[in-house]
Each structure stands twice: as structure tokens, then as C-alpha cells.
Amino acid sequence: SCMKAAPMKEISIRGQGSLAYPGLQTQGNLDTLSGPNDATRGLTSLADTFEHVIEELLDEQQVIQPSKENKDADLYSSRVMLSSQVPLEPPLLFLLEEYKNYLDAANMSMRVRRHSDPARRGELSVCDSTSEWVTAAEKKTAVDMSGATVTVLEKVPVPKGQLKQYFYETKCSTKGYAKEGCRGIDKRYWNSQCRTTQSYVRALTMDNKKRVGWRFIRIDTSC
């Protein structure tokens, strides 16, 4: 089978401030560019600026992580969100984690990648995947670290009411290339298959004895 992505790591920052976007200044816009060459330079400039912002966020993340003494810190995950409505975008910490994992796998620093061959930006994944927010109402049950099936609670009590639990899940795409095996594998000599893999995240759940608590459960996180 194809190489599987590394499990997502829990990110602990609750109660220690939040990440904020550094000042973002683009170098002109596409409407003011005069020709094809200028357009190419403009797009490259915007891409470099975006990567520079991510680099600063990752550097800041290492500074604001709490100490191990904060018992509530591990309740936060890059793939779990408590919200009154469906999140409109992927979680920022998830995007940072994905980008960092890519750089680690490619053995490159961000500064090196910004100045590398632009053609590398068009690389394709071995397996196609889809990601979306899933509610506890849709998920209903999950498997915890002990192998027991637990009920995922839809709402979490907070001082001013209740918030819903949302999980950002990634799984193999059911369309296109996934049915034919892994991309880049010579089908004449090798059999391959794209498979959805899971990782543990922290969620509010209830076991079969009606005991409610925060437990690590498995969700789909990669293909």
C-alpha cells in the first residue's frame, strides 16, 4: 500500500493567548500589472508573502505553547473546534501543521523553499483526499484509545450557554484517481491502494455507563 501520512499532533495553546496574523503587505495587485511577465512576478510575490506569514506564525507558535502544568491545554486540537456555527474555513493551526509536515518531508526550510524552483509548486499528491467539517450529530459514535465505542456529544457546556463540537476530517476521495491506485505507481508491476488513516483527537464523549468526559477518539485525518 502507499505510504501513509504521519498522524496529526495535538497542539496545545488554550489559555495562553491566540495566534494573530502579522501585518500583510502585498506588493501591488494584478489589476495594476502591465504584462504577462509582470503578472508572473506579481503572483510569485504574493506566494512568497503568504509563505513568509506562515513562517512567522510557526515561529510564534513555538513561543506561546503553554507549560505541561496547564491541565486544560491538551483539550485543544488543530482538528477540533467548538463553535456556535459551522466554521467557514479550515482551521489555521491545521494549515500550519500541514505546511510544516510538507517541509519536513521534503527536508527543506521555508526560506529555502521560497527561493527554490517555482515548478515544484505544481507537485501532485500520491493520493487525492477531501477535507470537511463534521458535526458530532453526523459522527454520533467513535472509538477511544481503549478500543471502546463512545458517544460523541453534540454540544459542550460553556459559561454562557453551549457550543457545538466540529471535527475537521480528511479522507480519500471517492472520485477520480483514487479508484485506480496510487498516483506514480507503475501498475504493470505493483498493486497499490489509497486508504484513509486515522489519528486521535480530544473530544467530549459519553461511555456506555453514561460517564461524560474528555477522551481521545479516532477520526479520519489523512489519505
Curated annotation (Swiss-Prot):
Q: Does the keyword Lipoprotein apply?
A: no
Q: Name one GO molecular function term.
A: growth factor activity
> Which residues are modified by glycosylation?
107
Please name the Gene3D superfamilies in this protein's record.
Cystine-knot cytokines (2.10.90.10)
Cross-referenced InterPro entries, in alphabetical order?
Answer: Brain-der_neurotrophic_factor (IPR020430), Cystine-knot_cytokine (IPR029034), Nerve_growth_factor-like (IPR020408), Nerve_growth_factor-rel (IPR002072), Nerve_growth_factor_CS (IPR019846)
Give start-end of the signal peptide.
Answer: 1-5
- Pfam family of the protein (one): NGF
What are the annotated disulfide bridges?
A: 127-194, 172-223
Q: Listed GO cellular component terms? A: axon; dendrite; extracellular space; synaptic vesicle
Origin superkingdom: Eukaryota
* SUPFAM superfamilies the record matches: Cystine-knot cytokines (SSF57501)
Q: What does this protein do?
A: Promotes the survival of neuronal populations that are all located either in the central nervous system or directly connected to it.
PANTHER family per the record?
Answer: BRAIN-DERIVED NEUROTROPHIC FACTOR (PTHR11589:SF3), NERVE GROWTH FACTOR NGF -RELATED (PTHR11589)
Q: Which family does the record claim for this protein?
A: Belongs to the NGF-beta family.
Protein name, as recorded: Neurotrophic factor BDNF precursor form
Q: What is the lineage of its organism?
A: Eukaryota, Metazoa, Chordata, Craniata, Vertebrata
| Protein's gene | BDNF
